[in-house]
């Protein structure tokens, strides 16, 4: 996953 990416937001 790219930096700053969050599936939970």
From Swiss-Prot:
Q: In which tissues is it expressed?
A: Expressed by the skin glands.
The answer to whether keyword Zinc-finger applies is: no
The Gene Ontology CC terms held by the record are:
extracellular region
- List keywords of the entry alphabetically: Amphibian defense peptide, G-protein coupled receptor impairing toxin, Secreted, Toxin, Vasoactive, Vasodilator
Keyword Secreted listed: yes
Report the GO molecular function annotations. Answer: toxin activity
Q: Which GO terms describe its biological process?
A: defense response; vasodilation
Q: Where in the cell is it found?
A: Secreted
Name the family.
Belongs to the bradykinin-related peptide family.
State what this protein does: Produces in vitro relaxation of rat arterial smooth muscle and constriction of intestinal smooth muscle. May target bradykinin receptors (BDKRB).
The protein, known as: [Ala1,Thr6]-bradykinin
